[in-house]
Structure formats: structure tokens, C-alpha cells
A protein has these predicted regions:
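Short acidic-hydrophobic, aromatic-tinged amphipathic segments that line or gate anion-handling sites
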Residues: 109-111
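STAS-typified acidic loop motif
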Residues: 4-41
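Amphipathic alpha-helical interaction surfaces in cytosolic regulatory modules
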Residues: 27-107
């Protein structure tokens, strides 16, 4: 399953790469985050409840802002509600800088 949102210029893709792992690519900004959130709720809902690890690999994210970080926080909340463990890999430098300045770096489960 692949989730694609936004115009060609701001397309965001979430593609499964392994069991419970997803590759995220594109632009995560105020413009794209709401539609990515809506699509990802459906995607996360298709995973079985409880006990499953979820990993989002953000290596393919080309640009992000604070809305991208907010999206990660929402994914964390949703995973916790579904009793799943979530981790993030390869956070873009912009997102890591925003998380650090916001004091959120320590709560992000990164590998």
C-alpha cells in the first residue's frame, strides 16, 4: 500500500518497506501535513492492534517545518493508543533542529 498526497511539487509518499516499516518521502509542511495525517490514520488502522512495532524512515523527506514535527507527535499518540511501539529513523536536519529548539528531541523515539 502506498499513500500519496499533494501536488507533484509537494507530493508525499508513505510506502511499506518491511513488516511495520514505512518509507516517507517528499515535503512535510503546513500544506501537506493535514492530508498526510488523514491518510496515515487509515494506514495505521490497517495494522493489527497491540504488540506491533512501527518504524517510519524519513530519509526521503526533502523539506519539513514544524507541521512535519507535529505529524510525528500525532503518529506517536496514535501508536500509543493502539498499544504499538513507534520509532523514527533518519530525521531530516530541519526537523531535528525544530525538535531541539522546541525541547521535543528527548521525547522522539529515534533509532
Amino acid at each position: 500500500m502506498s499513500v500519496i498526497n499533494g501536488s507533484d511539487r509537494n507530493a508525499v509518499q508513505i510506502k511499506p518497506s518491511a513488516e511495520g516499516s514505512f518509507l516517507v518521502s517528499g515535503v512535510l509542511t503546513f500544506e501537506t501535513a493535514p492530508s498526510v495525517w488523514q491518510s496515515s490514520v487509515t494506514l495505521l488502522g490497517t495494522l493489527s492492534n497491540g504488540g506491533e512495532d512501527i518504524t517510519f524512515d524519513l530519509q526521503g523527506v526533502s523539506h519539513t517545518d514544524s507541521a512535519g514535527l507535529a505529524l510525528l507527535i500525532e503518529w506517536m499518540r496514535t501508536a500509543r493508543e493502539q498499544k504499538k511501539r513507534i520509532t523514527f529513523k533518519n530525521l531530516p536536519p530541519q526537523m531535528l533542529a525544530i525538535a531541539t529548539v522546541s525541547g521535543l528531541e528527548s521525547i522522539l523515539p529515534m533509532v
